[in-house]
C-alpha cells in the first residue's frame, strides 16, 4: 500500500490578518468601553456611598454607642455626685483673714517704760525691744521730752534744738526696730511743765503780772522753775510741732503729760489775754486743737494722776475726763494701790464720762495695762 507523506499543518493566528484599520477600531472600542465604565461608576458612586454610610450607622455605630452610653452614664453619675458634694463643702464658711493692725490702733496689752539714754545704737535698740517682747509687753513708752524741757532727739524746732538733751536717739531707727519686734512705740512728751522751753522763748512762758520776768513756781533760791503758758498760741503750736516730728519719724501714738497749769493760782501770774476762759476751758481748747490738727493720723494719750482723774484740782480746774480726753493713762501713787474691783469701778466711771480707752499704772500692784 502506497504511503503518502503527512502534510504540514499551517497555524493561523488571527492577529496575522489584522489590518491597520482593524487595529484603530479596536483601540477606539476599548477607549469607549473605559469611558462607559467610568461614567457608570460616576453615576453609581453616590448610591454606593449612601448605602455604605447607612450600613455603618445602623450596624457599627449602634454597637459603639451602646458601649459608650454606659460610660457616659457612669461619668454623668459621678459628676452629679461631685456637684452634690460641692454645696456641702462650700457651705462651710472660710475663715476671713484678720485685718492688719495699724500703728494708730489701740490694742490690749501690757505697757512698760524704756530708758531712752540706753538706746545708743541699733544693737542696743533691738536688744531692749526684744527684752520687752520676751516679758510679754505690747506698748513701750519712750520719754522724748522730759519735765526739765530737754528733748532727746534732733528737733528742728528752734526751742527744741536749743534744749537738746546730752543723749540723742535716732528716732526713725527706734520706731522701726520696735515695730519690727512686735511692739507699739509711744513717744512721751511733757507739755507745759517746761522750764528750759520757757527760758529759751519768753513768748511761751507765764510771766509776773506787769513785768517781763518769768514767773517761777517757787522762790529762785528754792529751785523755782518757770512754766509754759497754756493760753499762748505759740505754746500750743510748739507742742504740736513736736508731735508732728515724732510722728514723721514713725511714732503713731503719743503720750502727752503735764497738760496742766501750775498748782499755784497766784494773782502775780500773767497769762496774757485769756478772754475770760478758765483753766479747764483753756486745757479743753488746747486738747481739741491738737486733736483737730492730727485727727486719725496720730493716737493721742493723756497722762494724769489718780487724784486729777477722780476729783477737781487747781492744775486742771475740773476732773481730767471732763477735758475732752478720749485716751487716758491714769497713774496710781506709789503710796496706794487699786484692787481689781476698784480698777473695774474706775473704768466704769471714766467710760461713763466719755473716756474711750483707759490704761492704769499701779506700780505697787505691778499693774500697767
Enumerate the predicted regions with their spans.
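N-terminal Lys/Arg-rich, disordered targeting/topogenic segments
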Residues: 1-27
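Hydrophobic membrane-insertion alpha-helices, especially the h-region
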Residues: 28-46
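Substrate-binding cleft of secreted/luminal carbohydrate-active enzymes
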Residues: 45-53, 320-369
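N-terminal, intrinsically disordered, polar/charged segments of Gram-positive cell-envelope systems
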Residues: 50-107
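Aromatic-lined substrate-binding rim segments of carbohydrate-active enzymes
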Residues: 93, 146-190, 264-298
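Active-site-adjacent "subsite" loops/lids of carbohydrate-active enzymes
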Residues: 102-113, 117, 192-244
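Catalytic domains of carbohydrate-active enzymes, especially glycoside hydrolases
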Residues: 123-151, 245-257, 320-330
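Aromatic-lined carbohydrate-recognition surfaces of secreted/lumenal glycan-active proteins
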Residues: 186-193, 254-258, 277-315, 355-364
Amino acid at each position: 500500500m502506497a504511503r503518502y507523506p503527512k502534510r504540514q499543518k499551517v497555524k493561523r493566528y488571527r492577529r496575522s490578518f489584522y489590518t491597520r484599520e482593524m487595529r484603530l477600531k479596536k483601540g477606539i472600542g476599548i477607549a469607549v468601553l473605559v469611558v462607559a465604565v467610568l461614567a457608570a461608576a460616576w453615576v453609581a458612586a453616590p448610591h454606593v456611598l449612601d448605602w455604605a454610610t447607612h450600613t455603618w450607622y445602623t450596624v457599627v455605630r449602634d454597637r459603639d454607642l451602646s458601649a459608650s452610653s454606659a460610660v457616659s452614664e457612669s461619668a454623668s453619675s459621678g459628676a452629679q455626685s461631685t456637684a452634690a458634694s460641692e454645696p456641702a463643702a462650700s457651705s462651710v464658711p472660710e475663715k476671713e483673714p484678720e485685718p492688719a493692725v495699724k500703728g494708730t490702733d489701740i490694742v490690749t496689752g501690757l505697757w512698760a517704760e524704756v530708758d531712752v539714754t540706753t538706746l545708743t545704737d541699733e544693737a542696743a535698740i533691738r536688744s531692749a525691744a526684744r527684752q520687752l517682747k520676751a516679758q510679754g509687753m505690747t506698748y513701750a513708752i519712750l520719754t522724748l521730752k522730759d519735765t526739765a524741757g530737754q528733748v532727746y532727739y534732733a528737733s528742728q524746732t528752734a526751742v527744741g534744738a536749743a534744749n537738746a538733751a546730752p543723749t540723742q536717739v535716732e528716732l526713725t531707727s527706734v520706731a522701726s526696730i520696735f515695730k519690727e519686734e512686735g511692739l507699739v512705740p509711744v513717744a512721751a512728751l511733757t507739755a507745759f511743765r517746761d522750764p528750759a522751753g520757757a527760758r529759751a522763748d519768753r513768748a511761751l512762758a507765764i510771766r509776773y503780772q506787769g513785768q517781763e520776768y518769768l514767773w517761777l513756781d517757787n522762790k529762785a533760791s528754792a529751785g523755782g522753775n518757770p512754766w509754759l503758758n497754756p493760753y499762748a498760741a505759740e505754746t500750743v503750736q510748739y507742742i504740736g510741732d513736736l508731735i508732728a516730728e515724732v510722728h514723721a519719724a514713725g511714732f503713731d501714738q503719743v503720750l502727752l503729760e503735764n497738760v496742766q497749769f501750775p498748782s499755784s493760782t497766784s494773782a502775780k501770774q500773767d497769762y496774757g489775754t485769756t478772754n475770760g476762759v478758765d483753766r479747764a476751758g483753756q486745757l479743753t481748747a488746747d486738747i481739741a486743737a491738737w486733736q483737730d490738727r492730727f485727727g486719725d493720723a496720730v493716737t493721742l494719750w493723756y497722762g494724769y494722776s489718780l487724784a486729777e482723774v477722780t476729783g477737781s484740782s487747781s492744775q486742771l480746774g475740773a476732773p481730767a475726763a471732763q477735758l475732752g480726753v478720749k485716751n487716758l493713762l491714769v497713774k496710781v501713787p506709789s503710796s496706794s494701790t487699786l484692787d481689781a474691783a476698784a480698777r473695774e469701778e474706775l473704768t466704769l466711771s471714766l467710760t461713763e464720762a466719755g473716756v474711750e480707752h483707759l490704761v492704769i499704772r499701779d506700780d505697787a500692784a505691778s499693774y500697767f495695762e
